[in-house]
Structures are given as C-alpha cells and as structure tokens.
C-alpha cells in the first residue's frame, strides 16, 4: 500500500480518471461531517456496534475492479490502513491510503480539521 497526503491524493485522482476514491468512515461521518467530492461511501465499520463490515471488500469490488487504483480515506488515516490491507489481501494491487484522512488529528483545543486533513488543505468536499 502506498500513502499519499491529501494534496497528493487529489492530484493522483485528477491524473488517473480510472482511480476510485472510497470513503470508509461511518455513514454519519460521511453524511454530516462531509466527504470529498466524488467519493464513494463504503463503511469499514459503523455504529452502533462498530463491527468490521464483512461485506466491505465485496462492496468495493462492485465499484472498482481489482485492476483499478483505489484511494481510500477515513477520518485521520487509521481505519483506511486496515481497510486498504483487506483490499490488498483480496487482490487489489493499487491501493493508496490518504494520510491525515478527511479531518486529521485533534489540535490543542481538541478540534479536527485545524492541523491537517482533506478539509484543512482546502480540497473539494461537500455535506448532505
């Protein structure tokens, strides 16, 4: 698995139109916190029990074949590593993790999107 900063991931997606951006956060994060424009939502895990989604790989396969590059993003770049490893194990050979994620880590005031992440870098995003 390769790792890209949010600006690198955005540039990669623009340069590779066959690449797919998968947002693996929970449904509530995706809908209410926001998500990168053009991303596909497939939860790695979700509430209320936060169990790993047993259909994750199959759901991603419906969106992208194992031959297409898959860029995967979560909140801060942790869940996306686990999700990316599952995709590699299933035969995906071009998996890219977005370092920093959509919101990045907490700052000194315990707020996200103030230090790093997709939103911090001013990349295109939307909310539902």
Q: For the regions a protein language model found, what residue spans apply to each?
A:
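Short, surface-exposed ligand- or partner-binding patches at beta-edge/loop junctions that are enriched
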Residues: 72-73
């Amino acid at each position: 698995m390769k790792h890209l900063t949010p600006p690198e991931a955005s540039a990669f997606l623009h340069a590779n139109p066959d690449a797919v951006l998968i947002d693996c956060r929970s449904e509530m994060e995706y809908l209410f916190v926001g998500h990168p424009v053009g991303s596909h939502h497939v939860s790695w895990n979700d509430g209320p029990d936060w169990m790993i989604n047993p259909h994750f790989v199959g759901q991603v396969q419906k969106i992208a074949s194992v031959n297409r590059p898959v860029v995967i993003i979560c909140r801060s770049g942790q869940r996306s590593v686990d999700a990316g490893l599952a995709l590699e194990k299933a035969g995906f050979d071009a998996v890219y993790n977005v370092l920093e994620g959509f919101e990045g880590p907490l700052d000194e005031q315990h707020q996200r999107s103030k230090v790093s992440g997709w939103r911090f870098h001013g990349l295109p995003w939307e909310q539902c």
